[in-house]
Every structure is written in structure tokens, then in C-alpha cells.
Amino acid sequence: MGKLALAAKITHVPSMYLSELPGKNHGCRQGAIDGHKEIGKRCREMGVDTIIVFDTHWLVNSAYHINCADHFQGVYTSNELPHFIRDMTYDYDGNPELGQLIADEAVKLGVRAKAHNIPSLKLEYGTLVPMRYMNSDKHFKVVSIS
């Protein structure tokens, strides 16, 4: 199925989106935005086809859950900070095969994990904010893990 090409611990602060909008915070997170764009550029140069995000804002009560629908599309408003992120559109392809493979391999190792290919299961901002900048051209497929 491929190989791990790049790993990064990154920010996903909602103020990155707020930084795009007119007002007193315009440009406040430009450094982080530029960094995300650079990660996307490096991934393209390495031939990456899918970005996997471990999303700390996808809250679950048990196990690891892998959101690997065929496609993610919608308009997102943060329940946590609706004054920072509201009406943010997104549209990305998913990678159900990779998501299922991750779950299967995790279970073999004794990790409680489950893959979900559910069209109504949406992405959270811990995935959406990085994808907005790393994947603005929709080059990469997306898998989100809780």
C-alpha cells in the first residue's frame, strides 16, 4: 500500500483560519500557514498520495476510530469556537482502503480500532485546518484518526 514518507507534529489552531479574515487578527498566523503550505509542497515532491491526520478534536470515548470515507464535503462551523471558525467549506477525497488497512493492522497488534466509511461522519477542525493549507488544491486523499 505504500510507505510513510513524512511525519510532522503540527499546529491546527483555529486562529489560522481567523488569520485569513479581515480585521485585527488578519495575518496573525501567517508563519503557521506558510509552514503548512511547505509541508504540502514537500509531500508533493515525495509523491505522497494520502495525508493521515491524528485529530485531537475528534473526541471519542473508546478505542481509535478511523474516518476513511470515500469523500468529505461540507461546510464546517466549530462547536468549540464558532467565532473563530464558521462556514468554512471543505471538499476532499478519502482513502477507504488505507483506513481499513490501518484498522486491521492495529487490531492484529491488540489495539482497539475501527474504520468507518460513513458519508455522514464529518471531519473535525483538527483535520480541516491543516488540510486547508497543506491540501488546498485537493491533491491528497485524507484519512482522519481519533
Could you tell me what each predicted segment is?
Residues 1-146:
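Soluble secreted/lumenal catalytic domains
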